[in-house]
């Protein structure tokens, strides 16, 4: 394999060789997990999206319609993009982020996918390393000492300055 060719964007078919069909790979992974002494769960936005916490589409328009109508619509295409919007005042910025935290962290119960993951790990040694800030691992039953949320938790969001300093 020529690494320079690889790094320049060679189509995957040129360098990926799959010895075993997908189903066999999944079965092998399941066997390895069954035999493991402990499991490290690495989770990012894809897990929460798969669980239903999507940042776009109807979930966004239903929960943020007043923001979409008031500000530049192209900047308000989903919750992620809207988080970077240069709101004219701190009150408007905090109104957005308060709604964002409510919709993604406070309001949702433990989602079935997270409950399923917890059910599989309940009696196993495990540790969770996540970039998710939606508190779903805790809601599903994982213990605080078994979770490292590298980007924090929406439930802990606060202004960097006290009110009397603003």
Regions found by a protein language model. Name each.
Residues 1-165:
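Conserved catalytic core of sirtuin-type NAD+-dependent deacylases
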């Amino acid at each position: 394999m020529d690494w320079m060719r690889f790094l320049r964007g060679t189509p995957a078919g040129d360098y990926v060789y799959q010895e075993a069909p997908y189903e066999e790979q999944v079965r092998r992974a399941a066997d390895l997990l069954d035999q493991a002494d402990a499991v490290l769960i690495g989770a990012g936005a894809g897990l929460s999206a798969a669980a239903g916490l999507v940042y776009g589409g109807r979930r966004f328009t239903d929960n943020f319609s007043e923001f979409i109508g008031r500000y530049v619509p192209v900047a308000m295409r989903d919750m992620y993009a809207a988080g970077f919007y240069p709101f004219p005042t701190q009150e408007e910025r905090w109104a957005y982020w308060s709604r964002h935290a409510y919709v993604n962290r406070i309001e949702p119960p433990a989602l079935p996918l997270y409950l399923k993951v917890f059910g599989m790990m309940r009696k196993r040694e495990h540790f969770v390393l996540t970039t998710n800030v939606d508190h779903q691992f805790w809601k599903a039953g994982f213990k605080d000492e078994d979770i490292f949320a590298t980007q924090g938790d929406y439930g802990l969001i606060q202004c960097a300055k006290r009110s009397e300093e603003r």
